Amino acid sequence: MSAALDAAQSAFGGPPSVVVNCAGIAPPKLVLGKKGVHPLDHFTKILMVNAGGSFNVCRLAAARMAAAPPLEGGEEKGERGVLINTASVAAFDGQIGQAAYSASKGAVVAMMLPMARELAASGIRVVTIAPGVFLTPMLEGLPQKVQDDLGKQVPFPSRLGRPSEYAALVQHIVENRMLNGEVIRLDGALRMPP
């Protein structure tokens, strides 16, 4: 991760002022499946990729932001940037077979406020987006009927979310300095069934 941040810093001529964590894995596994109990290493892997990966990026990016001078022309005195993490509605509405995924996204939600409070002294905000069902590469591989059925579960608009809608929220978070220490559900009022 340090190498990726080095590359970004070199390409953009300075440390990042906006970092978006938007990756994860979600392989389902029952706690008590037909093939036995849920392997602990499966649980640990999902937790480490989703929560550990988000934390790792945040800590490394925050160190670079904190060491940099405040943003020139920044609206707020001492502003250095924003870290935006991606959780999931599964953090709140976990489904059967998704104990590990829900726990990992719940951890992303849980670490956000302590990080926002700590990093505020350095002029760094932390915000988490909890998307519902979005047309991501993970879902694009599903048959169209499955995609349509997932979209119909969303009260309004009754469809899968679009990446452009996620991006629009990211842009708003960047521009609205009062958004700090918050989780924003982006789900069309979806509440996942068991």
Indicate residue ranges for each PLM-predicted region:
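Short, small/polar-rich loop/turn modules that mediate ligand/substrate recognition or access, typified
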Residues: A120, R125, L179-E182
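Conserved mid-core segment of classical short-chain dehydrogenase/reductases
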Residues: A26-T44, A63, A67-K77, G97-A100, ...
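Catalytic Tyr-x(3-8)-Lys segment
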Residues: M48, K145-E165
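C-terminal substrate-recognition "lid" of short-chain dehydrogenase/reductases
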Residues: R162-L186, R191
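Active-site helix of classical SDR
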Residues: C58, S104
